[in-house]
């Protein structure tokens, strides 16, 4: 009964219609049920059945006839019933020899918290510790030392080349950060041998997985809730990400001069992204959160969401020589130093940790995360630069140059001409994330995670001049010349041929089978207007005008 239950309320999320767990059609999945020295793993295959008359839409749960909505029937044989495997883990807590480290919101770590009702009056009941692996020097007094037990991650042997080498390279970047924290080869990445199960809690793993559609890669961990000690890191990398990056490069570069070649720059571009992705998700599993701070020092963290950096040369060609970063970032070194440095006996740890963050602030190396991106132009995701309006204009220039060159060279010989649309979509929306970043300056505020006594400026409003510059840049995205798809592109896109039906990576259309030339403009313009007039942004604008009429 414990295993044959809907522990995560999956039935409530299955659409369209209403689903119910059928225990008579469910069973224990023995292939993923096992026991290891420190953990027991159990899995059940649960079957959910669509209830009669619950609004399935007549297509067995495939979205009620709407091809743009993918319901249960898009991933199951039919939407009438679907089986899901649900996994349960029982993990032994570690020994009591680990020493937790205090949480600081400026340090970039996730926290574990609990209420301690025994603390003296005047001290906070909420205890906060960072999440991190246990790591100790063999020689604590040495400036550089090997670890008593290094942190080792094992890559899924099912990962194919050249992706395998790229993932190994990216994950290994973290050893640079641990070296900066005083360790020698304390962070290692190896291929997982057959003798090690990915379910064994004694080993950190990087899994390579497949999905029916693009989805997030993740970096999770099993953490001791008492101390924040990470017991096991689990990275899950989706195999479709690299395909999307490949297609983005095809749209921007239109690289198929003859149509039958395989331009090496496409793989180089995509593999550079995969190296960064590997480092990013591993970073989560060693305790770190996203860092979206727009630093004057440039790309400071692999914990950012990186947008491909493509520059426009004076002759109109595109420069992608620095499309993604190739090393660990300066912030990443600061964060690992904060979380993992072992101090000699007698050191005032709190003072040393605060000093690390103070030195980093002097170099404009700070931490801002997910909750900040909509409110301040100091932090954004999928963006480059640190002046949001200037960067949006630069990206619009790159987009315009690529659109002028875009054509049949964006697809290979033998591909249906209609499939040009797939490469056109990311090119036409090349600026979409920078629109969000630029809108954050409008009604925006600037702030830090200031602590009393650290001397930081807690809060100020974005200047009127900067807000107006951001609005000007956003208005450019609404100009007809930017929204209109050039005629030389429209003339290349026929209706979809048999076997190449509509799917989620295409623009919506209201023109039957013919390509709809208007809806891309509606999509792009709506994107800008929706972010510009977002409810909380509008409220801040009203407030700012009331507080400062100038």
Region locations from a protein language model:
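Short conserved micro-motifs at the rims of enzyme active sites and ligand-binding pockets
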Residues: 165, 246-247, 313-317
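Sec-exported extracytoplasmic/periplasmic mature domains
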Residues: 172-183, 283-284, 308, 432, ...
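Secondary-structure transition/capping motifs at alpha-helix termini
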Residues: 175-186, 215, 286-293
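The catalytic-center signature of Zn2+-dependent metalloproteases
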Residues: 191-210, 272-327
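Extended catalytic-interface subdomain
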Residues: 223, 229-237, 275-286, 328-351
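Conserved catalytic/binding loops enriched for acidic/polar residues
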Residues: 297-550
């Amino acid at each position: 009964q414990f295993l044959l239950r809907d522990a995560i309320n999956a039935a409530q999320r299955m659409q369209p219609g209403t689903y119910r767990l059928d225990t008579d059609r469910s069973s224990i999945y023995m292939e993923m049920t096992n026991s290891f020295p420190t953990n027991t793993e159990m899995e059940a295959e649960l079957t959910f059945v669509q209830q009669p008359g619950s609004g399935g839409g007549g297509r067995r749960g495939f979205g009620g006839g709407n091809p743009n909505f993918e319901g249960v029937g898009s991933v199951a044989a039919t939407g009438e019933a679907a089986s899901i495997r649900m996994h349960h883990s029982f993990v032994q807590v570690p020994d009591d020899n680990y020493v937790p480290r205090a949480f600081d919101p400026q340090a970039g770590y996730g926290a574990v918290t609990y209420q301690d009702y025994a603390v003296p009056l005047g001290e906070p009941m909420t205890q906060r510790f960072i999440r991190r692996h246990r790591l100790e020097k063999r020689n604590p007094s040495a400036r550089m030392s090997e670890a008593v037990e290094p942190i080792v991650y094992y890559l899924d042997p099912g990962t194919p080349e050249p992706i395998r080498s790229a993932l190994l390279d990216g994950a290994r970047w973290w050893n640079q950060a641990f070296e900066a924290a005083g360790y020698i080869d304390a962070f290692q990445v190896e291929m997982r041998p057959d003798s090690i199960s990915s379910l064994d809690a004694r080993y950190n793993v990087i899994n390579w997985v497949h999905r029916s559609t693009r989805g997030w890669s993740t970096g999770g961990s099993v953490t001791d809730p008492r101390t924040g000690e990470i017991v096991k890191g689990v990275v899950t990398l989706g195999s479709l990400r690299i395909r999307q990056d490949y297609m983005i490069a095809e749209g921007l570069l239109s690289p198929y001069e003859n149509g039958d070649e395989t331009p090496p720059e496409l793989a180089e571009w995509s593999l550079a992204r995969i190296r960064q992705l590997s480092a990013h998700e591993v970073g989560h599993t060693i305790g770190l959160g996203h860092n979206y701070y727009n630093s004057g020092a440039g790309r400071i963290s692999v914990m950012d969401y990186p947008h491909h950096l493509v520059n426009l040369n004076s002759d109109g060609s595109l420069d992608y020589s620095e499309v993604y970063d190739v090393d660990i970032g300066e912030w990443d070194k600061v964060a690992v130093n904060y979380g993992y440095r072992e101090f000699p006996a007698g050191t005032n740890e709190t003072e040393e940790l605060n000093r690390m963050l103070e030195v980093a602030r002097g170099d404009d190396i700070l931490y801002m995360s997910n909750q900040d991106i909509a409110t301040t132009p100091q932090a954004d995701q999928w963006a480059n630069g640190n002046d949001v309006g200037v960067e949006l204009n630069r990206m619009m220039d790159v987009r315009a140059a690529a659109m002028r060159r875009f054509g049949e060279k964006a697809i290979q010989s033998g591909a249906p001409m209609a499939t040009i649309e797939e490469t056109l979509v990311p090119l036409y929306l090349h600026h979409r994330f920078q629109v969000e970043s630029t809108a954050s300056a409008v009604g925006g505020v600037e702030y830090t995670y200031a602590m009393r006594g650290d001397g930081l400026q807690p809060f100020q409003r974005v200047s009127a001049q900067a807000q107006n510059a951001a609005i000007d840049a956003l208005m450019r995205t609404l100009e007809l010349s930017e929204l209109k798809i050039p005629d030389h592109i429209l003339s290349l896109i026929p209706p979809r041929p048999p076997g190449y039906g509509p799917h989620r990576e295409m623009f919506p259309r209201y023109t039957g089978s013919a390509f709809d030339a208007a809806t891309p403009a509606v999509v792009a313009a709506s994107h800008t207007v929706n972010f510009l007039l977002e409810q909380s942004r509008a409220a801040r604008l009203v407030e700012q005008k009331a507080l400062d009429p100038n």
